[in-house]
């Protein structure tokens, strides 16, 4: 009885010791880089059975990506998508609406946003174009050949697509399509 118990114990120890044997890749790592330990990510790639106990359902890489050998007609794969967390906005809506957006009120803006005057952030904020948004868009229109000719009063407020664009031919290079009365 004692002999069979000892043999069984020896068999269990041999089986447990065999599962922790170093793979050829681990042996090569020890020979090539004897002073540096193998990173866990590489060890998990080499021996995925050792990392099976530590895998969790939250592991999105393992749940979304799969191996090519698993892709064949009729195979069923389970994908777990975690719910995306809503990121925090820069400022709450009420506070963002209360910030005055005028260059003459720059000191008030800096104080509301807790930006010290003279800091690089304050300098960047004061270096913005000093024109109003309406003046900027008008300047953009005047410099663009698209807006170079004024629209006649009889023209509709919205553009109608050219027949060439509606047939799917699209815009040719070097030729702009515009509004038509």
Curated annotation (Swiss-Prot):
Residues 144-157 have a biased composition (Low complexity). Residues 128-143, 170-181 have a biased composition (Basic residues). Residues 112-181 are annotated as: Disordered. The gene is BURP7. It holds the Pfam family BURP. Expressed in roots, stems, leaves and shoot. It comes from the Eukaryota. This is BURP domain-containing protein 7. It comes from Oryza sativa subsp. japonica. Keywords: Signal. Residues 1-21 form the signal peptide.
């Amino acid at each position: 009885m004692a002999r069979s118990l000892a043999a069984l114990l020896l068999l269990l120890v041999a089986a447990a010791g065999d599962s922790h044997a170093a793979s050829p890749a681990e042996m090569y790592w020890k020979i090539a880089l004897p002073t540096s330990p193998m990173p866990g990510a590489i060890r998990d790639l080499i021996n995925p059975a050792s990392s099976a106990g530590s895998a969790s359902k939250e592991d999105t890489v393992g749940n979304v990506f799969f191996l090519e050998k698993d892709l064949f007609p009729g195979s069923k794969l389970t994908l777990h998508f975690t719910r995306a967390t809503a990121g925090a906005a820069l400022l709450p809506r009420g506070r963002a609406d209360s910030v005055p957006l005028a260059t003459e009120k720059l000191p008030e803006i800096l104080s509301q946003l807790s930006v010290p005057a003279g800091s690089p952030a304050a300098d960047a904020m004061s270096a913005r174009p000093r024109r109003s948004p309406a003046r900027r868009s008008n300047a953009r229109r005047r410099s663009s050949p698209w807006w170079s000719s004024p629209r006649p009063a009889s023209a509709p407020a919205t553009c109608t697509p050219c027949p060439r664009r509606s047939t799917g031919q699209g815009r040719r290079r070097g030729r702009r399509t515009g509004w038509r009365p």
